[in-house]
Amino acid sequence: MDYTHLLPYEIWLNIIDFLDKDKYNLYLTNTNFFSLLDYSREYFNLIDFIIETKSMEVLKYIYQSKTNGLIRNRFVKNITLNTSLLTSCQNGNILLVKFFIEKGANHRYSEDKPLGIAAANGHSDIVEYLVNGGANIKSRNNYALRFAVKNGHYNMVKFLIEQGVDITVFDYEVFYTSCEYGHYEIFVYLMKNINDIKKLNKKRLLKKAFKGGSVKIVHYIFNDILDVYRMFYHSMTRSELKNYKLLNIIGKYGNHDILEYLHNRYQLSDTNNIAQVAALYGHFRIVKFLLDKYLHELNLNQLIISACDNGSIKMVKFLIEKGIDINTIGNSCLSHAILSGNTDLLHYLTNIGCRLTSLENFFMKNLVSFYDIETINYLRNYITFDDQHYINTIMSTSMYCGIIKLVKYFVDKSSLDYESYICGIISNGHVNIIKYLLNQNKITKQNITITINNSVILTIIQYGHIDMLKYLVSLGINICINYALDRAVSYGHLNIVEYLLELGHNINEFGDLPLRSATIANNINMVKYLVSQGANIYIIKDNPIYLASIHGHVKLVKYFIDLGSDYHKKNELPLYVAIINNNLDVVKCLVEHGCKTKTTFFDPIETAMEYYNNEIVEYLQNNEIK
């Protein structure tokens, strides 16, 4: 008997909301509770939940009850057999896989995606079942092998290779993947099945192995694959090592065990770079190891600045204990600590004597963008220059960055000539800053009118600041529409183009410039809009088909042909430029739409041969038109 109707609708809603994810179990308690689905206020995939919990009996009941209106609308209506099959392959339930295939799911759906997902998750029984059913293990560019290797499923990798999958695809990608993810057994097995070891990129192998952190793989590479002994000698020049950038990878990913292995085997070179990278990424153990073993080679000042970039108080303290004179680099440490966003580090550095002696623009942008007023005011106590200069710099940077809360706070504290900042604020599109300064009588509309020139307007348009453009127009600023429209078209700002034309101008007033710019930029949406506004495609001197052909924009070539242009039939230039620019797609498009391959101006086949365009030669020979 169904008792769900005994409680009001609102109470069931509260129960369902309270249960959160456990509500799924409530729905599946018995068949009567299915009716609670009508009370659900959210969309969810209960079928996926059933698959994940491997509730075969519930699944069978649902499919046997398709005539039930609730089940039909809430389950079967939204069930996709193929996607349910994929979920089953991912969860590794072969019974469900067989169930959905029996119900009509395509076991080779989306180029054998079920097999690929099962292989990626290491479900050998499902893979074997699908292969026996005709699935192709090589589909989707060896998807099955590539992801089995990535996820470390050794038995799966072995099975796929035994079935004949190609381990060389994508330039031996699986070898590098096994190194990157540290799967030693898989890497060794792959090496045993390679025919030509020289095909492997040795530098790439090492880079991936250093990133993956497997000492076993690194040892195998050194002992069994390549001779890189000299790479780590002191005799190797810094420029050579910089080109390899191999050891820096250890610093970046913090693989201490590999670093120690290399140290025990070789005398490492350029350890200063490794240490700086490790400090930058916060790998304390690497930095400590290098300080212990190679102290005399390290630039401690550079090292502590990298540690400040990372924001690591622990590392900064450790380096100071090594004897760094903080007074000599206090400004740099504070400036780089600002980049880290770590307020605690700023406090620590100021407490031990660091002071700001200069205000570099790059650091000030970070200061106003990522710190609160309290921290900015705090730093005022630790500067070695005039406080007013600090306030003015904060204010000017805040205006350029559009930080309105800081502008409001410092507006009456600074001694700036705000008129001189109008161009910069407007160029950066900060309408709110300009309006605020106007309201505070720090600038006037006349200041804006006198200051703004065409160059500033074009900069606004280039960066897509449409709100600023509209605001300036509302102030009566004159816009040179011709240049403005061309800039908006060239940079793909369709909303600005629409706005400029809404000001009452005809698109053909400006000659061929807008359509030409849109065509060169390969912006088909812009071209379509301009045409919809009445742009005449024949206004372009060289014809749009020629212009699109010379730049290789095949979609635009076809679009202009579809609009009715037959320039390519009467003129040989589009085909000529497509051939000499080796653009087969454009050549095909022109020929398929009536362009002759026998011309008086030039011989297309001979021209293609002259430019060594073999594919075009073959195509033209097979599609020769008198």
UniProtKB/Swiss-Prot annotation:
Repeat as UniProt keyword: yes
ANK-type repeats, residues: 42-72, 80-109, 110-139, 140-169, 171-199, 201-230, 242-269, 270-298, 299-328, 330-358, 393-416, 417-446, 452-479, 480-509, 510-539, 540-569, 570-599, 601-626
Protein name: Putative ankyrin repeat protein R837
Repeat listed as a keyword: yes
Top-level lineage group: Viruses
SMART domains per the UniProt record, alphabetical: ANK
Parts of the chain that traverse the membrane: none
Keywords from the UniProt entry: ANK repeat, Repeat
Gene3D superfamilies named among the record's database cross-references: Ankyrin repeat-containing domain
